[in-house]
Each structure stands twice: as structure tokens, then as C-alpha cells.
Amino acid sequence: MINKSTPILHVEAVEPGLKFWTERFGFQTTIQVPEGDHVGFAALDNGTVELMYQTYEGMKNAGPLAEAAAHGPSFIFMEVSDIQTIKKALEQTQIVQDIHETFYGAQEIVAKEPGGHYVIFSQLPAQPNH
């Protein structure tokens, strides 16, 4: 019934988000739609995770969705295999919460991506073999 879920992050400018994900985490830009002299919409993919970015300007004619998009930021939860590698990739990025253990046993670090959205990188605890 439901095949896929992809967050759309609304931002003032798409380009900083593209640079963040492609340079730090190896994502590929799969779609770019121009909006005047800049990118108005883009999709990124790393083979497992897909993200989309759209400018607030591009949302201005979207009726009630335009107002909702302006209320952000979004929170994105990303499961990772090595939290220390993620921390290194986040150098020169605003860290909101450094590596910590959660109540469910995960090791997490929270950062703000260039558009102001929160990204929670989580290394979940190993599952016992049964």
C-alpha cells in the first residue's frame, strides 16, 4: 500500500543542503529543478535514503501547504552504523547535542543542516542473537 517515504525539507536556499549531503555523506543529486538563477527543488539519494529540498519561494502558491512549510524546522532521524564516523563528517557543522546515550540504548548525535533542520544520527544498540 505505501511504498516509500521521503522527507521534503523547505529552505531559503537549496544549494547549501545539496553541498552538505553530497560532500559530507556521499549522497548524489538525482533531480534539480531551476527557479530563476538558483535551484528551486532537488532530490538526493545515497542508495538507501532519499531527501528532497524545496525553497519557500517554490511553495508560495501551494495554498495551505505554503504556510505549513514556513513553520519548520523538521526533525530527521537517520540510523547509522558508526556514530564516530558521522561525528567526523560533521566537523564545522552546528552540533546541537554531542554524542550521548538515549533511554533506548542508542548512541546519538544531533546536528543542524544548513537549512536549519535537525538531523538525529543514531547508532542503535546491537540486537542479541536468538
Stretches found by the model and what they are:
Residues 16, 83-87:
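Short, conserved charged micro-motifs
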Residues 17-22, 90, 113-116:
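Conserved active-site tyrosine of GNAT-family acetyltransferases
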Residues 25:
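Major-groove DNA-recognition helix of helix-turn-helix-type DNA-binding domains
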